Amino acid sequence: MALNKPKIVILGAGYGGLMTVTRLTKYVGPNDADITLVNKHNYHYETTWMHEASAGTLHHDRCRYQIKDVINQSRVNFVQDTVKAIKIDEKKVVLANGELQYDYLVIGLGAVPETFGIKGLKEYAFPIANINTSRLLREHIELQFATYNTEAEKRPDRLTIVVGGAGFTGIEFLGELAARVPELCKEYDVDRSLVRIICVEAAPTVLPGFDPELVDYAVHYLEENGVEFKIGTAVQECTPEGVRVGKKDEEPEQIKSQTVVWAAGVRGHPIVEEAGFENMRGRVKVNPDLRAPGHDNVFILGDSSLFMNEDTERPYPPTAQIAMQQGITVAKNLGRLIKGGELEEFKPDIKGTVASLGEHNAVGVVYGRKLKGTPASFMKKVIDNRSLFMIGGLGLTLKKGKFKFF
Amino acid sequence: MALNKPKIVILGAGYGGLMTVTRLTKYVGPNDADITLVNKHNYHYETTWMHEASAGTLHHDRCRYQIKDVINQSRVNFVQDTVKAIKIDEKKVVLANGELQYDYLVIGLGAVPETFGIKGLKEYAFPIANINTSRLLREHIELQFATYNTEAEKRPDRLTIVVGGAGFTGIEFLGELAARVPELCKEYDVDRSLVRIICVEAAPTVLPGFDPELVDYAVHYLEENGVEFKIGTAVQECTPEGVRVGKKDEEPEQIKSQTVVWAAGVRGHPIVEEAGFENMRGRVKVNPDLRAPGHDNVFILGDSSLFMNEDTERPYPPTAQIAMQQGITVAKNLGRLIKGGELEEFKPDIKGTVASLGEHNAVGVVYGRKLKGTPASFMKKVIDNRSLFMIGGLGLTLKKGKFKFF
Ligand SMILES: Cc1cc2nc3c(=O)[nH]c(=O)nc-3n(C[C@H](O)[C@H](O)[C@H](O)COP(=O)(O)OP(=O)(O)OC[C@H]3O[C@@H](n4cnc5c(N)ncnc54)[C@H](O)[C@@H]3O)c2cc1C
Ligand SMILES: Cc1cc2nc3c(=O)[nH]c(=O)nc-3n(C[C@H](O)[C@H](O)[C@H](O)COP(=O)(O)OP(=O)(O)OC[C@H]3O[C@@H](n4cnc5c(N)ncnc54)[C@H](O)[C@@H]3O)c2cc1C
């Protein structure tokens, strides 16, 4: 047994990090390297399902699983701790409760909400980010409904939910809300007509980048289910009372709301920025082999990274799909770095994108085919199950998968 | 058919009011009188189960049923409205959306929390009173737990629950909390040891009036399940930060808590007071036939009334048990008033009192026998089912009853 085995440290047990770890043991033998995975919690959560946990349509426990259940515990050290800093020069990771030395580092810390400096959003708006924020938002909405009937003077702002952003996350969350609000009305004896769901989007269209036919379908479905859209309208400020929004060159409007949700953007994890990597909004533009430029022993993947599409000369949008595929490449390349061989270039294989509209509806493109309604919703669940399958195999898929197809 | 049938109006569909209405049709024929029942909601709720709904151990929908399902709709007019005032001189009831003229009036509006003028309790403490307050308290507690892990600086006051009052309601609520807190800890990833449940009671003992052996049993059980008791200690003030409490002649103590529950007393409904009846804390000391002194056409029952125990020369404590028994007497006496006959005197038949300590434990006295543990818990459920049976018969009991005996 080698005494000085190289140390591989993987930060984050998200889609990218966990995929790396589960594949790594194929390419790196027990005598080749020590493997350590660091994650804040002892569980992995499905970031792509957080709109459901946030609305309360899917319990958060259905959206997470124990990390120890999917890693090879005899090969991988799991450290439950919070990464505080990465010291590149000292090859060291500072944790809340200790430090780790590495020879090879994989960064998969994911994203954090981006508020673009809009006043008050950080303080008063709810992000859709992880298990903690999802439980908070779900409970906050429930408390607003629960409070409504206990007050002598009725407050419509308790029943007004503003969603900032009509991109992927915003639309998926609105889809869940449209299903959840009638349930909340029943649970708390509130008339549905008193509840307002307002989506505010600065861009001139909903779901930018999506096929216009699918966009129309989604907007129509959501409007039919009580969502009001304010398109081409920017959130200018968030306060404890609500939001100020406005169209260009028009008088701003105040919307009173106790529940402002910010779903209009994410950026890379600040720790990556603070570590000194060159970055754009916290994302490091990685080399084709997924290493950070100038750092031959550091791989960065998923939402912490930025990968260019050679054809369009624009970066790929950060998705779980890409993060997982990158995990496979990182695992392979770590094997080659340690045991020799040429590093592989990452080649994304975009199978499609489907945005859910509640449990039974969706829009998207899969293998180049436009889908909407039941077929799209079916595919969405197949995709959701696929992440489980790729990381945890059939057992995990059966345990946590979505099988209520129709 | 008589053109000028007398009008009977019953206010409140609680234990007393609903019992009156369901029995009244036995003593008063369709040609004898018009019967109108007024209640704020279209449902009756089990006030005696509100500690469960408030803690979240029993869903509030399990604690209520539709009024129309238990009244004879061909005989009883049901008006869903809020009573705003009673004008005795004009024989008129003012509702939020109208007025009702009566010849005979039955008042069963129940109780409201009594804060004894303690500063801040009205504003910042949670009562355990009805479906609305229960949902609010349940959701408030959940939100505190949900928030805890989302804050960088951990706030113990989110996990500190103070219950003011170790009487019947306080102890029953503590019993539910003891069961609920471990569930909340699991749901929100909070360590049980971080949660504090503190009971503050000004009187020198827990459950005043109960047998000391049963009191010891209850205190021991609750302490074992993590409840801290501060006995002989008064709540002096409630603020948004928590409570100030103190023993006589000692330095007061500040307890930081986001959840202060006030379970230390109720008083009669203010509408009864405002109507001009002579009263003590909103309760009218009624004649033996349950009429208000000086008002031959007005019956008052349940928590709105005060009925003297001739033996002890003290009033009976207000209970659902008595309210229901009074309903039977009121129905009979209304029949006699209208059709002739001497009015009956109300004779309470106290079968016992059982305080639950969560779902599987309780203490109490039934037919003079002391009970604790499983037998007491069994009897508690029998009593809970009995109210359903008396008002709605077997059908309602099977639908809403508590049958998980062990
Ligand atoms: C509501 C929503 C819906 C989405 N839908 C889709 C979709 O349908 N399809 C799709 O492909 N993509 C979707 N995305 C995008 C997708 O979720 C992300 O691109 C993906 O999660 C990125 O994976 P990752 O491995 O980089 O990070 P993540 O999967 O987010 O994981 C990051 C991990 O790092 C951990 N971590 C963070 N900070 C620290 C720290 N300081 N110390 C220790 N551990 C830390 C976290 O706990 C987490 O486990 C969606 C996103 C959202 C929010
Ligand atoms: C947590 C708890 C546990 C208890 N446990 C027990 C127990 O184990 N055994 C026991 O015997 N007693 C118990 N009690 C006491 C018991 O609940 C009361 O004594 C009983 O509810 C009194 O019945 P009531 O008919 O007077 O009023 P309630 O049953 O309280 O009904 C009053 C009704 O009036 C309606 N109302 C109020 N205001 C208006 C308005 N302005 N307009 C129209 N309608 C209105 C309400 O909606 C309600 O339907 C408990 C009380 C609590 C809070």
Curated annotation (Swiss-Prot), chains A, B:
Sorted alphabetically, the Gene Ontology BP terms of this entry are: aerobic electron transport chain
Q: Which Gene3D superfamilies match?
A: 3.50.50.100
Q: Which residues cross the membrane?
A: none
Cofactor(s) recorded in Swiss-Prot or TrEMBL: FAD
The cofactor binding remark recorded in the entry reads: Binds 1 FAD per subunit.
Q: What is the uppermost EC class here?
A: oxidoreductase
Q: Which GO terms describe its molecular function?
A: NAD(P)H dehydrogenase (quinone) activity
Enzyme Commission designation: 1.6.-.-
Keywords carried by this UniProt record:
FAD, Flavoprotein, Oxidoreductase
PANTHER family the UniProt entry points to: 64 KDA MITOCHONDRIAL NADH DEHYDROGENASE (EUROFUNG) (PTHR42913:SF3), APOPTOSIS-INDUCING FACTOR 1 (PTHR42913)
Family in the record: Belongs to the NADH dehydrogenase family.
Record protein name field: NADH dehydrogenase-like protein YumB
